[in-house]
Amino acid sequence: MSNKVHLGHTARKRFGQNFLTDSNVINRIVGAISPDNDHVMVEIGPGLAALTEPVAESIDKLTVVELDKDLVERLQTHPFLKDKLEIHQGDALKFDFKQLVEEGKQMKVFGNLPYNISTPLMFHLFEFAEHIENMHFMLQKEVVLRLSAAPGTKAYGRLTVMAQYFCQVMPVLEVPPGCFTPPPKVDSAVVRLVPYKEKPYPCKDVDLLRHLCTTAFNMRRKTLRNNLKQLLNDDDFSALGIDASMRPEQITVQQYVAMANHLVDKRQA
C-alpha cells in the first residue's frame, strides 16, 4: 500500500494532507488541548480523526471545519463520532468562526493544519481572537519558530508581530516527520496561542498595524527609514524614540504598535 494511504484514504497534495499517526504525540496534544464542555470545542481539518476521536471521547459536542468532501462523509458515518459532531464542510480560510460562539462560552480551537495555508489561516483566526480562549495547532516547525521569535532574530517578521500582538505564544512540542502518513518533508511542532483578554499594547487601528508590518518587512535588509518613508519621517521616528536606521526585525511589538498609534494620531490631528 502507498505510504500516502492511511485508513483507506489517500492523502491529497492539494489539501496539504499529512495524517498524524503517532499515539504518544496524539495523547500529548490532547492533554495540552484539555477538552471540556465549558468551551465551544472547534477542530480545523479533522482529517481521519486522529485528534477528533480522543477529544470527542471526553466532551458532549465537537464542532469541526473540513474542506475535503470525502473526509466529511467519513465523519458523518463514523460509528462513534457522528452523534457528537457538528460538521461544517468548507474552507477554514473563509469561515466565519464567530457563528460558532455560544452565550457565555469562549472557543478552544485546535487542529493539525495543512502547512500550505497555515500562515494566512493564522491571520484569519486573529480576527476572532476576542472569542477564543486558546488555540493549539500542529504546524511546520519553521512557522512555530516565526510565531514565537524574539526581535533581532532571523525568524522574527510580520507574522511574529501580529501573533504576539494578539496572543501569548508558547511552543509545546516538536514532532518528527515519521509521526505522519505520508511523512512531510519538514519537521513539525505544536504551538499554544492564548489571546490576550487585555492587550499589553493596545492598537488604535489594527488594520493599519497590519499594513505597517507588511510594509516594514517587505525588504528586510533595508532600514525603517527606507521601508516606511511613505508613512513616517525622521521627525516621527524622533518623537517615538525609535532609531530610523534600524532594520524591521530589530523593532519590538510595542514599538510597532506605537508607530501605528502615532500614525492614527497624525491623521486625526
UniProtKB/Swiss-Prot annotation:
Keyword Transport: no
Record-level Gene Ontology MF annotations: 16S rRNA (adenine(1518)-N(6)/adenine(1519)-N(6))-dimethyltransferase activity; RNA binding
Amino acids binding S-adenosyl-L-methionine: 18, 20, 45, 66, 91, 112
Presence of the UniProt keyword Transferase in the record: yes
Subcellular location: Cytoplasm
Record-level GO cellular component terms: cytosol
Transmembrane annotation, as ranges: none
Catalytic reaction list: adenosine(1518)/adenosine(1519) in 16S rRNA + 4 S-adenosyl-L-methionine = N(6)-dimethyladenosine(1518)/N(6)-dimethyladenosine(1519) in 16S rRNA + 4 S-adenosyl-L-homocysteine + 4 H(+)
Main location: cytoplasm
One Pfam family here: RrnaAD
Keywords recorded for this protein, A-Z: Cytoplasm, Methyltransferase, RNA-binding, rRNA processing, S-adenosyl-L-methionine, Transferase
EC number(s) stated in the UniProt entry for this protein: 2.1.1.182
Similarity-based family: Belongs to the class I-like SAM-binding methyltransferase superfamily. rRNA adenine N(6)-methyltransferase family. RsmA subfamily.
Job description of the protein: Specifically dimethylates two adjacent adenosines (A1518 and A1519) in the loop of a conserved hairpin near the 3'-end of 16S rRNA in the 30S particle. May play a critical role in biogenesis of 30S subunits.
Protein name as catalogued: Ribosomal RNA small subunit methyltransferase A
Species for this entry: Shewanella loihica (strain ATCC BAA-1088 / PV-4)
Higher taxonomy: Bacteria, Pseudomonadati, Pseudomonadota, Gammaproteobacteria, Alteromonadales
Gene this chain is encoded by: rsmA
